[in-house]
């Protein structure tokens, strides 16, 4: 199956561009020749012939049924197709997460071999990647907006003090300018605070590991990440026609893995909550994707996938417990 492939095959599927951050980390670790050819840096981007062969057969098999996949295929009057929601940034985010997991494993491996110098070098690389990952996640979660709101609040306090001094000295021209600046900053602060609050109070209809179906394109998908609002660029949102959605960009967006048997050329999609639908009955059908075994422990009794602990911690999501049903024992 696809998910049995090694980590070294992950970046060859489709036209995946690895971020400059990840590429720099890989090259840096590789230059150190850490732990020989067992280190991820020496094989992370190495292509697997057996995987390419399997991937080619998957694509050929699906070419025969691409037109009959879903009655709403093609996006209706919009003329969109699934590739409009392709997200290289989401895929890169996942690859960085893989790199974190692998570096942590290599640190432990070096410690077990009592190669402490190597372990220290790996730990330093891991710390760099973790710090960058945290910074990116905080930006998505609104931490930067909250900080910006606080900065504007401090500026307003200072301007009010200047305003009072201008009034006391009867410099009414300066006072008028300061009053206008304060009004402008207050409006900006209110908007930024509202954005930060939206991030903090975000509610998600779907959870990590849940199997879903795209409302328009019909493909099956599994949630592997989530943002309170759309974090993609304005050009991406324009191409995906996000503004035509009922809630636009101000709604949760999900990183989803797409079943390669349905769309072998679309690994990761970035989809609005409005465009996703949970199945009425448990989906226990086979789901193929090269990232599955790295992001999930396996499937639960309802057919959804169980995210690894590190993935839950990344998005600060609780562990999902499948409700007990006595009929399952029959």
From Swiss-Prot:
Keywords: Chloroplast, Coiled coil, Plastid, Transit peptide. Residues 66-138 are annotated as: NTD, required for CLPS1-binding. PANTHER family: HEMIMETHYLATED DNA-BINDING DOMAIN-CONTAINING PROTEIN. This is Clp protease adapter protein ClpF, chloroplastic. Residues 112-139, 175-195 form a coiled coil. The keyword Plastid applies. Residues 203-310 are annotated as: YccV-like. The gene is CLPF. Expressed constitutively in photosynthetic tissues such as leaves, stems and flowers, and, at low levels, in siliques. It comes from Arabidopsis thaliana (Mouse-ear cress). Binds to CLPC1 and CLPC2. Interacts with ClpS1; this interaction stimulates their association with ClpC. Associates with the Clp substrate HEMA1 (GluTR). One of its GO terms (cellular component) is chloroplastic endopeptidase Clp complex. Clp protease adapter that facilitates CLPS1 recruitment to ClpC chaperones thus forming a binary adapter for selective substrate recognition and delivery to plastid Clp protease system (CLPC).
């Amino acid at each position: 199956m696809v998910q049995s492939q090694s980590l070294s095959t992950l970046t060859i599927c489709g036209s995946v561009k690895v971020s400059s951050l990840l590429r720099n980390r890989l090259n840096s670790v590789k230059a150190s020749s850490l732990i020989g050819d067992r280190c991820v840096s020496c094989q992370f981007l190495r292509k697997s012939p057996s995987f390419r062969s399997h991937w080619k057969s998957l694509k050929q098999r699906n070419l025969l049924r691409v037109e009959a996949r879903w009655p709403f295929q093609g996006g209706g009057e919009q003329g969109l197709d699934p590739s409009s929601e392709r997200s290289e940034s989401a895929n890169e985010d996942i690859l960085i997460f893989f790199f974190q997991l692998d570096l942590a494993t290599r640190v432990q491996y070096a410690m077990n071999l009592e190669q402490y110098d190597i372990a220290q070098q790996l730990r330093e690389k891991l710390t760099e990647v973790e710090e960058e990952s945290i910074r990116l996640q905080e930006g998505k979660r609104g931490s930067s907006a909250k900080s910006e709101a606080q900065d504007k609040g401090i500026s307003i306090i200072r301007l009010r003090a200047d305003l009072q001094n201008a009034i006391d000295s009867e410099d009414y021209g300066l006072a008028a300018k300061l009053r206008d600046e304060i009004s402008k900053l207050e409006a900006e602060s209110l908007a930024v605070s509202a954005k930060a609050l939206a991030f903090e109070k975000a509610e998600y209809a779907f959870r990590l590991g849940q199997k879903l179906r795209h409302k328009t394109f019909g493909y099956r998908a599994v949630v592997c990440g989530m943002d309170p609002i759309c974090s993609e660029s304005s050009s991406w949102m324009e191409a995906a026609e996000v503004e035509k959605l009922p809630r636009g960009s101000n709604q949760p967006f999900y990183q989803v893995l797409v079943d390669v048997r349905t769309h072998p050329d679309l690994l990761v999609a970035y989809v609005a909550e409005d465009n996703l639908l949970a199945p009425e009955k448990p989906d226990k059908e086979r789901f193929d994707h090269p990232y599955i075994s790295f992001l999930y422990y396996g499937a639960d009794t309802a057919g959804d996938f169980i995210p690894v602990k590190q993935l839950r911690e990344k998005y600060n999501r609780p562990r999902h417990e499948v409700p007990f049903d006595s009929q399952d024992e029959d």
